[in-house]
Design a protein with these regions (language model features):
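Active-site loop-to-helix "anion-binding N-cap" substructures in soluble metabolic enzymes
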Residues: 2-138, 142-155, 169-170, 175-181
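Short beta-strands and strand-loop turn motifs
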Residues: 6, 163-164, 185
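Active-site donor-nucleotide binding/catalytic segment of nucleotide-sugar enzymes
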Residues: 158-170
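Conserved small/polar residues in nucleotide/adenosyl-binding loops
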Residues: 183-189
Length: 195
């Protein structure tokens, strides 16, 4: 049997960049702490652990005073950066540039929607590190939808700014946008009955 591996397969550039930054930090410092697994790949996490990377949670941050803490490609909310500063933790920020741009867009979206009484909606997986980082960019509530059924959370009488987690399907995002447009058309249909 012959197995071919697509030359374009593998980690996204944000994860490749984060792994490279982690390797550099490990080479310089010998030991680095990562806030959550650097990547959703057990083999790669174990390889980095053998080099001196330790995965920690937010609850363990107080014990890292004076040490280096790695922010993975998924990014973090501003509260994490503030806590690290308060605790004297040096951050190695490997937030993916695409995610960082999306974080800024979330802040801008909330400002625009605040002015018109609207709402910000993100297509994403609840509890995923990137989504936690996105929703944590502002104090105002952000709706997170995973499926068409979740559109029931949206108040279609108010303006909507719809964004997506970077790893979500473009076709699902477009489908949900189309459904939102249907519900907000001049004669909106009830989302519960027009699926």
């Amino acid at each position: 049997m012959r197995v071919e591996i697509d030359s374009h397969s593998g980690f996204c550039f944000g994860v490749v960049r984060a792994i490279s930054r982690a390797e550099e930090a490990l080479q310089e410092q010998g030991e680095v702490f990562s806030l959550g697994d650097i990547v959703h790949n057990r083999v790669e996490v174990q390889r980095l652990e053998r080099l001196g990377m330790h995965t920690v949670t937010h609850d363990q941050m107080p014990g890292l005073k004076g040490r280096s803490l790695f922010i993975r490609a998924h990014g973090e909310p501003p509260s994490t950066y503030r806590l690290a500063e308060e605790l004297g933790i040096e951050l190695i920020d490997a937030t993916c540039p695409v995610v960082a741009k999306l974080q800024r867009r979330v802040v801008e979206a909330h400002e625009k929607m605040r002015q018109v009484g609207g709402q910000v909606v993100i297509l994403g997986k609840r509890g995923h590190a990137e989504v936690i980082g996105l929703t944590g960019q502002v104090e105002a509530p952000t709706l997170v939808v995973e499926t068409e059924e979740d559109l029931d959370q949206i108040d279609f009488t108010r303006p909507i700014y719809f964004l997506s987690q970077t790893t979500q399907s473009i076709s699902l995002f477009q489908h949900l946008c189309d459904r939102c447009l249907l519900y907000t058309s001049p004669s909106p249909r009830d989302p519960k009955t027009s699926r």
